[in-house]
Amino acid sequence: LEWDKQRLAAIHNEVKDIKIPYTKSGNIPYYLDANGRYENKDRLMKLLDFADKIGALERIILLEEPFPEEYKVDVSDIPARLAADESAHSDKDAIERIELGYGAIALKPIAKTMSMSLKIAKIAHEKGIPCFCADLTVNPIMVDWNKNVAARLAPLPGMRIGVLESNGHQNYVNWQKMK
């Protein structure tokens, strides 16, 4: 928690005054992926209270998968848009997370299959929940597949453009050769 606070503060201090055309606020949005490391709401709220104190809370456009998958609790009172990722394996899982108050769903057309991703996207759309694509460290050709899906999704609230998480270049030594 303390490391997360300090990292958020360091990033916020570096970019808080930079303006961009891609958000409605003109500010750089923060996309935090906790990968299930917050064991409960109280602990997560300590991070978000800190974010509010330093002026960073309003910049958090997504807080992805803050809790372990088995932690099923109403999150509608959390002052940031929580995104389900690893906990939304299926359309049934996505419905459950939406009912718990999650405000976005990560689609993974490569990992969750295209057909399941489209089912999840349809359900989320019907319930007014935005989706975005995440790449699960896929290779360059598969990133293009995700771009194809992402291009058909509405922008996340507060954004003027779509969002696609892509981190394969950080995990493949020969990324440039694979292009």
Predicted segments, located by residue:
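Flexible C-terminal active-site loop/helix
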Residues: 137-179
